[in-house]
Amino acid sequence: MRIVLVGPPGAGKGTQATRLAETLHIPHISTGDLFRANISQQTELGKLAKSYMNAGNLVPDEVTIAMAKDRMEQPDAEGGFLLDGFPRNVSQAEALDELLETEGMKLDAVLDLEAPEDEVVKRIAGRRVCRNEPKHVFHVTYTPPKKEGVCDVCGGELYQRDDDSEETVRKRLEVYHTQTEPIIDYYKSQGLVATIAATGPVDEVTRRALEALKRDQ
């Protein structure tokens, strides 16, 4: 299956993408991973992307699309893939359609993870990360540490990342509504969108997504 996963920041896209990709035995292709891999391997595309990022500019669509194309042409993606973070706008969605068409392929489904805005803000703004090990993540409401401000695992100081402040989260949501949300209508016109409630236990959200994919087959 060839799937696109969309949803606002904090809807749990990364978590669900990993779980769905494992269940469906297809690679999880995230734009964040693509950028990191190309930059660390110093590919031509990676060098190009880094030059834009270092200048404080957005990486042009054609660079992102070229990276996605390279990844989708890898042998492990022959049987399908799950795209997370791409396409990010309508022009990228159109480019993806053209790309797939030239290969004689098409998307099977677009999963739209929906979560109320206040819930998204609460999820992200409540995150606290360990200064010693960024993988040690807690939440002031859902998974609080035993001692406030102290990592349960290593005793390191817990802090709120700048990206996780309420003001920054609301700005990111604004960008999502303006740039990314229009692709949902674009894909709805092709009959590809399944809306998934991204609230409740993680397992339940995964179950809803898999059920929606079964209905679309």
From Swiss-Prot:
PROSITE patterns linked to this entry: ADENYLATE_KINASE
Domain of life the protein comes from: Bacteria
Binding site for AMP: T31, R36, N57, L58, V59, G85, F86, P87, R88, Q92, R161, R172
UniProt key word GTP-binding: no
InterPro entries: Adenyl_kin_sub, Adenylat/UMP-CMP_kin, Adenylat_kinase_CS, Adenylate_kinase_lid-dom, Guanylate_kin-like_dom, P-loop_NTPase
Key words of the record: ATP-binding, Cytoplasm, Kinase, Nucleotide biosynthesis, Nucleotide-binding, Transferase
Pfam families for the chain: ADK, ADK_lid
Region (NMP): 30-59
Entry keyword annotation includes DNA-binding: no
Binding, ATP: G10, A11, G12, K13, G14, T15, R127, V137, F138, G200
Annotated region (LID), positions in chain: 126-164
EC class (word): transferase
Matches recorded under NCBIfam families: adk, PRK00279.1-2, PRK00279.1-3, PRK14527.1
Family assignment from sequence similarity: Belongs to the adenylate kinase family.
Comment field on protein domains: Consists of three domains, a large central CORE domain and two small peripheral domains, NMPbind and LID, which undergo movements during catalysis. The LID domain closes over the site of phosphoryl transfer upon ATP binding. Assembling and dissambling the active center during each catalytic cycle provides an effective means to prevent ATP hydrolysis.
Protein name: Adenylate kinase
Native source organism of the sequence: Streptomyces coelicolor (strain ATCC BAA-471 / A3(2) / M145)
Gene name tied to this protein: adk
